[in-house]
């Protein structure tokens, strides 16, 4: 059997287990001839075990026969950090205004979750990446 030829890749951020065939998904998939309701059904099934509503990146590969496959990534680090310390958004002036503090344990937990998506060879390298993300949001890292 011949390998399918990929003709397009679509990147979206969609709420886990709560995707709906609305404007955002329809506008992204429609021009490529992909069935929005079919994607929504498969996406919701695959993300059913995740926290409902947490935004997750998804990369959709569209093939020449209008079929598709997709990969669900881990939630963005900023969302995991905001959830861990219970804030709505990061600081607008992260170098002067601090919005909260996060423990090293919580950062390491987030680093372990994100490890598969990060370009890091070790947990300590992943920890440094996530700690940098936290600092850029105006979140202090406990010493």
UniProtKB/Swiss-Prot annotation:
InterPro entries for the chain: Ribosomal_uL11, Ribosomal_uL11_bac-typ, Ribosomal_uL11_C, Ribosomal_uL11_C_sf, Ribosomal_uL11_CS, Ribosomal_uL11_N, Ribosomal_uL11_N_sf
GO cellular component, one term: cytosol
Post-translational modification: One or more lysine residues are methylated.
GO annotation terms (biological process): translation
Family annotation (CDD domains): Ribosomal_L11 (cd00349)
Gene3D superfamilies per the UniProt record, alphabetical: Ribosomal protein L11, C-terminal domain, Ribosomal protein L11/L12, N-terminal domain
Pfam families reported in the protein's UniProt record: Ribosomal_L11, Ribosomal_L11_N
Cited function: Forms part of the ribosomal stalk which helps the ribosome interact with GTP-bound translation factors.
UniProt subunit comment: Part of the ribosomal stalk of the 50S ribosomal subunit. Interacts with L10 and the large rRNA to form the base of the stalk. L10 forms an elongated spine to which L12 dimers bind in a sequential fashion forming a multimeric L10(L12)X complex.
Family the entry assigns: Belongs to the universal ribosomal protein uL11 family.
Listed name of the protein: Large ribosomal subunit protein uL11
Species of origin: Borreliella burgdorferi (strain ATCC 35210 / DSM 4680 / CIP 102532 / B31)
Gene: rplK
């Amino acid at each position: 059997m011949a390998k399918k030829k990929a003709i397009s890749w679509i990147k979206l951020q969609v709420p886990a287990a709560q995707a709906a065939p609305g404007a955002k998904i329809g506008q992204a998939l429609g021009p490529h001839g992909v069935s929005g309701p079919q994607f929504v059904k498969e996406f919701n099934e695959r993300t059913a075990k995740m926290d409902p509503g947490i935004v997750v990146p998804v990369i959709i590969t569209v093939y020449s026969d209008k079929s598709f496959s997709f990969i669900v990534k881990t939630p963005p680090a900023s969302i995991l950090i905001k959830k861990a310390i219970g804030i709505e958004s990061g600081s607008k002036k992260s170098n002067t205004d601090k919005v909260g503090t996060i423990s090293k344990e919580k950062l390491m937990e987030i680093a372990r979750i994100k490890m598969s998506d990060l370009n890091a060879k070790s947990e300590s390298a992943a920890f440094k990446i996530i700690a940098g993300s936290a600092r850029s949001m105006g979140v202090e890292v406990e010493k």
